[in-house]
C-alpha cells in the first residue's frame, strides 16, 4: 500500500511570504493530502521538496508571487528540474466562499496547478534580463530622488532671503546646481537663517550631482546589456535604450513562454478587448497588461509619428476613415508590438545565454 502511494503522482502548491512559505499537496483526484509551513531558506526549500515528494512523484508545483517572495523558491525548484507554474490571484467568488488564510491560499495554488487554471509560465530570472531589471529599478529610484532634490532646491530658493535669491536668478538648471555645489558655507553658523539656507542648498545640490552621475553610470550599463541582447531592436526607428530595455524586461529571460504575438500584445496592454452584445459589435481600450511596456510602445509610436513618413500616412488614413488620432495611435502601438515580438523571438542570441554568476 505504501509503494502505491509513493508511486502516485501528486501536485504541489505554495503560498509565499517573507518569512514562511505555506505548502500544500493534492493527489490525482485533486484531494488535499496535507499542508505544512516552511522557512524561506535553502534548508526550508529542501525540507519542502522532501515533504512534497514523500506523498508521491511530484508532477508540478504552483507557486504564487514568483517575482517577489517566491523568487528564491522558484530558482531552487527550477534548478531541481521541476515543472513550476506561477499561480495568479484566487478567484473572487471562491475567495468569498472559502475565506482567506495562508493554508487556504496554498491549497488554492495546488488546485490551480492541478487543473491548469489561473496559471502562467513564470519568468526564469536567471539571465541578463534579470540584471537589466535590477539596473532599471535602481535607475528609476535614482531619477525619482534626483527630481525630489531639485524640487526642494527650487522650494528653498523661493523662501530664501532676498540676498540669496538675487544671486541665483537667470541661471540654467545645471548652472544653478553647480553654483550651489561650489558654495562654502560655515557649518558652525547653523543658527543663522541665511547661512542655514546656504548649507541646505549646497547639500541638496551635491545630492543632485551625485544622483546625476549615478544615473549616467547606470545608463552605460543598461545600454551595454541592450546592445548585447537585442542589437536589431535598438536599430529600429524611434526605439531608444529606455524603451528597448523595458520591452526586454516585459518579455523576460524566457520569451518562448509567450506563445504568440497576440499574447505579447495582451501582455503590453495594446490588444483590443471585445465588448460586443446583440447587434452591437465593438472593441474597447485595454487598460490591463504591463503599463510600463505600454508606455514604451506609446513613446515609440509618438517618435515614429514625428519622423517616419509611412507612420504619418497610416495615421492620416485612419483619421480620414473616421477614427480619432488617439485611436489611430492605439492601432499603431498594436503593430509595433508585433514588430517587437518578431525581433525578440528571431534574434540570433538567446536572451538567457549568459546566466547570472552565483
Regions found by a protein language model. Give the residues of each.
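Short glycine-rich phosphate-binding loop at a beta-alpha junction
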Residues: 58-69
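Gly/Thr-rich phosphate-binding beta-strand-loop-beta motif of the actin/hexokinase/Hsp70
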Residues: 2-27, 109, 142
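Phosphate-backbone recognition surface of nucleic-acid-processing proteins
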Residues: 234-235, 241-325, 353
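Short glycine-rich, Thr/Ser-proximal phosphate-binding strand/loop in the N-terminal lobe
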Residues: 19-43
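Short, basic/hydrophobic alpha-helical segments
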Residues: 43-60
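Short alpha-helix plus adjacent loop in nuclease-associated cores
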Residues: 78, 84-122, 130, 134, ...
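Glycine-rich, often acidic, oxyanion-interacting loops/wings at catalytic, nucleic-acid
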Residues: 137-232
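Basic, amphipathic alpha-helical segments enriched in Lys/Arg and hydrophobic/aromatic residues
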Residues: 320-358
Amino acid at each position: 500500500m505504501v509503494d502505491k502511494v509513493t508511486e502516485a503522482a501528486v501536485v504541489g502548491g505554495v503560498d509565499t511570504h517573507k518569512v514562511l512559505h505555506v505548502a500544500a499537496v493534492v493527489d490525482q483526484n485533486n484531494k488535499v493530502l496535507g499542508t505544512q509551513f516552511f522557512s524561506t531558506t535553502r534548508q526550508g526549500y529542501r525540507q519542502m521538496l522532501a515533504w512534497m515528494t514523500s506523498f508521491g512523484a511530484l508532477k508540478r508545483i504552483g507557486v504564487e508571487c514568483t517575482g517577489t517572495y517566491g523568487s528564491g523558491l522558484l530558482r531552487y525548484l527550477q534548478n531541481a528540474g521541476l515543472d513550476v507554474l506561477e499561480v495568479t490571484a484566487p478567484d473572487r467568488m471562491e475567495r468569498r466562499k472559502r475565506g482567506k488564510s495562508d493554508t487556504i491560499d496554498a491549497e488554492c495554488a495546488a488546485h490551480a496547478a492541478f487543473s491548469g487554471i489561473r496559471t502562467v509560465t513564470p519568468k526564469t530570472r536567471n539571465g541578463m534580463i534579470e540584471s537589466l531589471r535590477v539596473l532599471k529599478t535602481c535607475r528609476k529610484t535614482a531619477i525619482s530622488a534626483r527630481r525630489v532634490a531639485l524640487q526642494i532646491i527650487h522650494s528653498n530658493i523661493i523662501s530664501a532671503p532676498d540676498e540669496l535669491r538675487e544671486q541665483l536668478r537667470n541661471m540654467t538648471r545645471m548652472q544653478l546646481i553647480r553654483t550651489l555645489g561650489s558654495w562654502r558655507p560655515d557649518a558652525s553658523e547653523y543658527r543663522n537663517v541665511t547661512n542655514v539656507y546656504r548649507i541646505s542648498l549646497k547639500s541638496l545640490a551635491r545630492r543632485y550631482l551625485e544622483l546625476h552621475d549615478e544615473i549616467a553610470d547606470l545608463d552605460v550599463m543598461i545600454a551595454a546589456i541592450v546592445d548585447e541582447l537585442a542589437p536589431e531592436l535598438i536599430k529600429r526607428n524611434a526605439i531608444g535604450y529606455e524603451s528597448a530595455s523595458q520591452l526586454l524586461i516585459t518579455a523576460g529571460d524566457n520569451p518562448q513562454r509567450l506563445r504568440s504575438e497576440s499574447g505579447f500584445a495582451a501582455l503590453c496592454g495594446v490588444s483590443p478587448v471585445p465588448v460586443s452584445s446583440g447587434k452591437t459589435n465593438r472593441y474597447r481600450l485595454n487598460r490591463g497588461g504591463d503599463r510600463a511596456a505600454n508606455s514604451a510602445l506609446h513613446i515609440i509610436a509618438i517618435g515614429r509619428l514625428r519622423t517616419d513618413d509611412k507612420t504619418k500616412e497610416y495615421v492620416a488614413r485612419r483619421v480620414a476613415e473616421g477614427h480619432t488620432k488617439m485611436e489611430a495611435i492605439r492601432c499603431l502601438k498594436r503593430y509595433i508590438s508585433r514588430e517587437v515580438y518578431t525581433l525578440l523571438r528571431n534574434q540570433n542570441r538567446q536572451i538567457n545565454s549568459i546566466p547570472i554568476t552565483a
